[in-house]
Amino acid sequence: MGRALLLLVLLAACAPLPEGPGLPYPGGFVRGSVVEGRFQAILPGAPLLVDADAEALYAAYPYQLLEVRAGKVQSLPLPGVPRFLRARPGLAVGLEGGVLTPRGLLPYPAQDALETPEGLYWVDAEGLHLEGRLLLPGSFRQVVAWEGEVVALGTEAHFFPSGRRLALPAPALKAQAARCGVAFLAEGGLAHLLTPTGLTPLGPAEDLAAWEDTLYLSPGERTLRCGGGP
């Protein structure tokens, strides 16, 4: 597996760079197989999903997860095609049969999930769950950890455990936590920044990511700083 992966990486490095919009991750963009920004690497191909924590970038493919750490690429097997990928607080990969975490495959039908020291928070059409316990009823698509709270997003944003809630302009399709709030992409192609006091529109986007004080949006490989400005 290691020699085959090395060959794929070398072949990708020799191939022409593919055209297309950059895929944002927390700290930069992946354009085709080329990782730019906070991490630097050549992947064997364009990933389906990408995310990162403070120390590693994860790129998900059918039946394979690549970890880029300290300039090295490691291949990890996946028992299926990934449906979602979360690197923070802990690694969680959504699959048809459950959620893969460092603790193993957990049999929850999640649309999104967070691996935390308290356990796996996950969301679906019934609500926000912690492992096998329903915490909040509702229909949610995204869940992030922000400022000591778990934020579940659907047509509304619910903050747990404080109980605060805010209506969203459209259902959330993707969300990531930044230092200044929760950046999310809504149906209709508009990005917003969510805080407990309200919403700030960020403009049109098809994908987004967040790291510390910076938001990454595509297409156009745009970056925004918390508080406004590039």
Predicted segments with their positions:
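C-terminal motif of bacterial Sec signal peptides marking the signal peptidase cleavage site
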Residues: 12-13
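Post-signal peptide N-terminal segment of secreted/secretory-pathway proteins
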Residues: 48-51, 57-72, 86
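Blade-level signature of beta-propeller repeat domains, shared across WD40, Kelch, NHL, RCC1
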Residues: 206-230
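Surface-exposed loop/turn elements that mediate protein-protein interactions on large endomembrane-trafficking
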Residues: 32-43, 64-77, 97-109, 125-137, ...
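Repeated scaffold domains used in trafficking and secretory/extracellular systems
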Residues: 17-26, 45-54, 80-88, 108-118, ...
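Sec-dependent signal peptide recognition
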Residues: 2-7
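Residue position within the beta-strands of beta-propeller blades
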Residues: 31, 59, 93-94, 122, ...
